[in-house]
Swiss-Prot record:
Belongs to the small GTPase superfamily. Rab family. Gene3D superfamilies: P-loop containing nucleotide triphosphate hydrolases. This is Ras-related protein RABG3d. GO terms for biological process: protein transport. The keyword Chloroplast does not apply. It is a lipid-anchor. The gene is RABG3D. NCBIfam families: small_GTP.
């Protein structure tokens, strides 16, 4: 039986404090959501294996603090990223207006080799709030901004309801992999003493 290649991808999630970065990560990795808000201190990360076609990807997803006092830590966390996810709250205009600042800061601190083609994905989160009545950022406005930045993929999500989360992270995985060098390092399958293999995959569609 041929070995499936396991590719490690580093994904950074950026955005203002309170837009739902931690909730999106926990919904995708653990299928859990908490109404209790707790600000991320510095940065934290979770990992999850995603299978797309014949490849198994290990996503290392970094959730970073949105507070300004932690932004100086960025250079240590951003370096080596394969994709950057920009998150805003569709009910808070300021969080959308700040997307450009987060994008520019990432490019400066991460210093990717090809900044013009580095993959970003934008998520407009919290679409569930008040059944959409509190929304202030239209989908049209968000897509126009993404188009102006090189046609960045855009998804509207609800971490609370799990809406579009899997589809967004499948797109994130594919874009991160495109940023990998052709001869990317890979992790071989691990086989336990009973001869079984442990695999996890998502059933998301892009």
């Amino acid at each position: 039986m041929s070995s499936r290649r396991r590719v490690l991808l580093k994904v950074i999630i950026l955005g203002d404090s309170g837009v739902g970065k931690t909730s999106l990560m926990n919904q995708f990795v653990n299928r859990k959501f908490s109404n209790q808000y707790k600000a991320t201190i510095g940065a934290d990360f979770l990992t999850k294996e995603v299978q797309i076609d014949d490849r198994i990807f290990t996503l290392q997803i970094w959730d970073t603090a949105g507070q300004e006092r932690f932004q100086s830590l960025g250079v240590a966390f951003y370096r080596g990223a394969d994709c950057c996810v920009l998150v805003y709250d569709v009910n808070v205009m300021k969080s959308f207006d700040n997307l450009n600042n987060w994008r520019e800061e990432f490019l400066i601190q991460a210093s990717p080799s090809d900044p013009e083609n580095f993959p970003f994905v934008v998520l407009g989160n919290k679409t569930d709030v008040d059944g959409g009545k509190s929304r202030v950022v239209s989908e049209k406005k968000a897509k126009a901004w993404c188009a102006s930045k090189g046609n960045i993929p855009y998804f509207e999500t609800s971490a609370k309801e799990g809406f579009n989360v899997d589809a967004a992270f499948e797109c994130i995985t594919k874009n991160a992999f495109k940023n990998e060098p052709e001869e990317e390092p890979y992790l071989p399958d691990t086989i336990d003493v009973a001869g079984g293999q442990q695999q996890r995959s998502t059933g998301c569609e892009c």
